[in-house]
Regions:
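Generic detector of multi-pass transmembrane helix bundles and their immediately adjacent loops
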Residues: 1-81
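Divalent metal-dependent catalytic cores for phosphoryl transfer on phosphate-bearing substrates
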Residues: 70-216
Length: 216
């Protein structure tokens, strides 16, 4: 308000050279404009809730690695955290190349593996010599790996992450198989018809180009 008022006063003084000719109504308009700007930021979040969209402002805030959930991941699953940072940079660069929304895919990449925080030691990037999968069957190991999708969605719900971020969590493996455990099981049971659903991620497959970039 003050900036608008001072600029208007200066320009009018230059052009009119007469203070009595100043249009005082303009100051009222400047004041109204200042009030609207003051409420614009909180209104943005209200509109997001009502209409179900996520603004770039929200995505930028979520991508701050000092927020509580990402900070927790860096402590509980440091290998996964580093992997997510690398994926965020790579996926954002790839999205830029194909005309995708780089900020969206960057933020989605930061959160896509948050479910690994529930059982961090079962994922290679967090292991330090001991592999807990050795005490499990191939089917059990596959279910632990697959569960990082459902666990991630539960954490996303708990922390009120927007739907567009949840979609990255659910789609980043699509309907693919946990191939290592599936192939290992098949090799040990060559005469058995294997139920692929025991080794399959719940999906769905990616349905936006940003999700497809992250999956690749």
């Amino acid at each position: 308000f003050i900036s608008y008022a001072l600029l208007y006063f200066a320009f009018e003084l230059i052009h009119e050279d007469d203070l009595t000719k100043l249009n005082t109504r303009m100051y009222i308009y400047f004041m109204i404009n200042g009030i609207l700007l003051l409420f614009a930021y909180p209104l943005l979040f209200l509109l997001e809730k009502i209409f179900g969209f996520t603004s770039d402002v929200t995505l930028v805030e979520l991508s701050n690695i000092n927020n509580s959930l990402l900070r927790e991941m860096s402590e509980v699953a440091p290998g996964t955290f580093q992997h997510s940072l690398q994926m965020a940079n790579l996926a954002a660069a790839a999205a830029n190349k194909i005309g995708g929304k780089s900020q969206l895919v960057r933020t989605g990449a930061l959160y896509h593996d948050i479910g690994k925080m529930v059982n961090p030691a079962f994922f290679t990037e967090n292991q330090s010599g001991v592999n807990p999968h050795k005490s499990l069957s191939y089917e059990q190991s596959a279910q632990v790996i697959i569960s990082h999708i459902t666990d991630g969605l539960k954490l996303a719900e708990k922390h009120n992450l927007p739907k567009v971020i949840k979609d990255f969590i659910s789609t980043h493996h699509g309907r693919g198989l946990t191939k290592y455990f599936y192939i290992s099981y098949k090799n040990e049971h060559p005469d058995e018809e294997v139920d692929q659903e025991k080794f399959r991620y719940p999906g769905p497959n990616p349905f936006t180009k940003e999700q497809a970039v992250l999956m690749m």
